[in-house]
């Protein structure tokens, strides 16, 4: 499982001109599912999403996590993160999970996140989405579990 996370001042995702999720200060996480991803990868990814220290403390050091600051989490499915880009000028998606597995794993990650955080929002698997954000930093990390 892959996540591209960004520290944001605010973010939102729209599907068909309808807001499906919006957060204030927190983390926007684009999520890619790979073949073989299951409960161990989901559990680890959720630990990383909630515990990765990307928010500043009083001294200006990145020493606080999403859980520490009680921030929002916006999860957006993005299968293109799992693309194979090693050759040619066109990505191959053979390294991404099939849609049924991707949807299942994304939805389970979303459900599990909602049991641990009060502010969890999401995009819609398989939909064309428009994501708007105000990046804070910018601070962006690639996480893999």
Predicted regions and their residues:
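N-terminal, polar/charged subdomain of small-to-medium soluble alpha/beta proteins
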Residues: 1-89, 104-145
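A charged helix-plus-loop insertion that forms the helical arch/lid used to bind
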Residues: 87-97
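Extracellular glycan-recognition regions
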Residues: 101
